[in-house]
């Protein structure tokens, strides 16, 4: 059986990357929350 996680850097960046987060209001909310929490990494 094929495993469900088949990593792809491009797909990861497009779905969860910084520029994608910045492109929507809710995405910016995610980044703000992660900054508030003090996350070292904000986006993929």
From Swiss-Prot:
<dbReference type="GO" id="GO:0003735">
    <property type="term" value="F:structural constituent of ribosome"/>
</dbReference>
<dbReference type="GO" id="GO:1990904">
    <property type="term" value="C:ribonucleoprotein complex"/>
</dbReference>
<keyword id="KW-0689">Ribosomal protein</keyword>
<protein>
    <recommendedName>
        <fullName>Large ribosomal subunit protein bL34</fullName>
    </recommendedName>
</protein>
<comment type="similarity">
    <text>Belongs to the bacterial ribosomal protein bL34 family.</text>
</comment>
<dbReference type="InterPro" id="IPR000271">
    <property type="entry name" value="Ribosomal_bL34"/>
</dbReference>
<dbReference type="GO" id="GO:0006412">
    <property type="term" value="P:translation"/>
</dbReference>
<keyword id="KW-0687">Ribonucleoprotein</keyword>
<feature type="compositionally biased region" description="Basic residues">
    <location>
        <begin position="1"/>
        <end position="19"/>
    </location>
</feature>
<feature type="region of interest" description="Disordered">
    <location>
        <begin position="1"/>
        <end position="44"/>
    </location>
</feature>
<dbReference type="InterPro" id="IPR020939">
    <property type="entry name" value="Ribosomal_bL34_CS"/>
</dbReference>
<dbReference type="Pfam" id="PF00468">
    <property type="entry name" value="Ribosomal_L34"/>
</dbReference>
<feature type="compositionally biased region" description="Basic residues">
    <location>
        <begin position="26"/>
        <end position="44"/>
    </location>
</feature>
<dbReference type="GO" id="GO:0005840">
    <property type="term" value="C:ribosome"/>
</dbReference>
